[in-house]
């Protein structure tokens, strides 16, 4: 354990070093004894220290037990290693609490029965995510080699991620950079905030594509991937995404969902 990386949670340390694994998957490996700290089992929240020895035993890949569902998919690109999907709004990416069926994973298993198992049984092939109501480009790994390579590129911030957002009002500048840190809201735990004392670095470039009296179309380029990053940063500017029930509920009633689309994905 290098001294400059000491005193952080074990699961966070592992997530930084092993981007191909989701944090929930790593927490599961710690709890089930596949990760040992100084030869002993431990807990995901244990704070690692300089000089600690961490051992990870490769766990067998989990058998995928989600059921295929014939949900139509718009495939933008596909080869033997990856699939790029234009995800529709309203579709949850992977099964979780409250969404055990009718997800993108169920649709993918119908389209392509073999997917990478690195993400665990609930997230086969899933390398990154989009919020339920966000539409647009999402890449999925068909095999473990593709999963590891894509995860590495995302972790190294080499993936180009460009979004289009329809926001309220006119922006004060035609283009700019937002670098406010983002963390969990101190009171509303389902929200993220730039006011969090434990915020993590986040960077969003933006450019106004066109604007009218009441709304603007904005192109946003992400250099990090914090939860709700674009929605939080644009809300911070005073130009929230239209239709956003979480950050601008008063402006959401006339829209079926928040107006955010993952336009381009380059890797």
Regions found by a protein language model. Name each.
Residues 1-267:
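RNA pseudouridine synthases
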């Amino acid at each position: 354990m290098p001294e400059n990386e000491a005193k952080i949670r074990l699961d966070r340390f592992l997530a930084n070093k092993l981007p191909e694994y989701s944090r929930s998957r790593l927490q599961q490996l710690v709890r089930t004894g596949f990760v040992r700290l100084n030869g002993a089992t431990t807990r995901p929240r244990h704070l690692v220290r300089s000089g600690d020895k961490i051992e990870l035993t490769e766990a067998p890949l989990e058998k995928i037990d989600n059921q295929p569902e014939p949900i139509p998919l718009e495939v933008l690109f596909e080869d033997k290693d990856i699939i790029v999907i234009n995800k529709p709004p309203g579709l949850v990416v992977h099964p979780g609490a409250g969404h055990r069926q009718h997800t993108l994973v169920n649709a993918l298993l119908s389209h392509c029965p073999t997917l990478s198992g690195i993400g665990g049984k609930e997230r086969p092939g899933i390398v990154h995510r989009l919020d339920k109501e966000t539409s647009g480009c999402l890449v999925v790994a068909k095999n473990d080699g593709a999963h590891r390579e894509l995860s590495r590129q995302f972790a190294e911030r080499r993936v180009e991620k460009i979004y289009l957002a329809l926001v309220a009002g006119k922006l004060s500048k035609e283009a700019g950079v937002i670098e406010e840190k983002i963390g969990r809201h101190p009171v509303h735990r389902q929200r993220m905030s730039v006011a969090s004392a434990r915020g993590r670095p986040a960077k969003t470039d933006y450019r106004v594509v066109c604007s009218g009296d009441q709304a603007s179309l904005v192109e946003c380029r992400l250099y990090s991937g914090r939860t709700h990053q674009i929605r939080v940063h644009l809300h911070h500017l005073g130009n929230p995404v239209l239709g956003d029930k979480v950050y601008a509920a008063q402006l959401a009633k006339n829209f079926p969902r928040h107006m955010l689309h993952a336009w381009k994905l380059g890797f």
